[in-house]
A protein has these predicted regions:
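N-terminal signal peptide c-region/cleavage motif recognized by signal peptidases
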Residues: 13-17
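Short alpha-helix in the alpha/beta-hydrolase fold that links the catalytic acid
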Residues: 67, 191-201, 211
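Primarily recognizes the serine-hydrolase "nucleophile elbow" in alpha/beta-hydrolase
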Residues: 114-175
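Short, proline-enriched alpha-helix->beta-strand connector loops that line the catalytic pocket
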Residues: 174-179, 205-208
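Acidic catalytic loop of the alpha/beta-hydrolase fold
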Residues: 186-190
Length: 257
């Protein structure tokens, strides 16, 4: 009887769960019109922590938006940023590569566009600017690293099956954000020597970093349940690695935000 009363009391005390709200945000960088998407739970009162999501090289597709929604369901204000331009989404590797190279060819511009995305999150009026982070997938993982190298306001950056641009010597002692990366041992897009160099350069830069490498046949796009639809052998979903990386990410945000 005591247990029943306790459970009933808890149920009565639980607030009505609000639905995640969403808003389209239009902005511009270097003549390119960009369209991002903001997600938040309006049951949350006051300015809280915010997380920017950077898409993979396919563009700002439903997968990136889904991750932003998942963050909102966890109580974060999330912004799915656009790094390519309004409507630039594809499932064709050649087109994806073209758009990606257009952005990454100018590293300063690449960093500026990422910072502008974070600025949209801050300008939402829903976020405490001292409690922001960013996550990114594939190309987006490389993008959040560029944010770290350029002195981002984000307290933490997290990358999944990311390209791994090494920290330049000029940022030694200047990386003020926590860097966390999740990588698959079976990812043939990133050579072992690239991984080693990436780790060494972060260490030389005196960065606060952590890298989780999932062993076995964990490949690129291990977080994406639809990875196989692209028909690329190196893209493969791994439910265990997906769940583990997401859980560790949420733990990190509880610690840093």
């Amino acid at each position: 009887m005591k247990r029943l009363i306790t459970v009933m009391t808890l149920l009565l005390a639980m607030p009505v769960q609000a639905e995640v709200q969403t808003k389209t945000v239009e902005y511009e960088h270097d003549g390119e019109k960009l369209t991002g998407h903001l997600y938040w739970d309006d049951a949350k009162k006051g300015n809280g922590p915010g997380v920017m999501v950077i898409h993979a090289w396919w563009g700002l597709n439903d997968y990136a938006k889904t991750r932003a929604r998942m963050l909102a369901e966890e109580g974060y204000v999330a912004f799915a940023a656009d790094m390519y331009g309004t409507g630039k989404v594809t499932d064709k590797p050649a087109q994806a590569k073209e758009w990606m190279l257009e952005v990454t060819a100018d590293v300063d511009g690449w960093q500026e566009r990422a910072a502008l995305g974070l600025e949209q999150l801050k300008k939402s009026g829903l976020v405490d600017p001292q409690r922001m982070a960013a996550i990114g997938y594939c190309f987006g993982g490389g993008t959040i690293l560029q944010m770290a190298y350029s002195g981002t306001e984000a307290k933490a950056v997290v990358g999944y099956h990311a390209s791994l641009p090494a920290a330049p010597e000029s940022v030694k002692g200047k990386i003020g954000t926590k860097v966390m990366m999740f990588h698959g041992h079976g990812d043939k897009f990133v050579a072992p020597e690239v991984v080693s160099n990436f780790q060494n350069k972060l260490e030389e830069a005196d960065a606060d970093w952590e890298m989780v490498i999932f062993g076995g046949d964990v490949r690129h796009s291990f977080t994406n349940p639809d990875a196989a639809k692209y028909g690329i052998e190196n893209l493969k979903y791994d439910a265990d690695a997906d769940a583990a990386s997401w859980q560790r990410t949420l733990e990190l945000f509880k610690q840093t935000l």
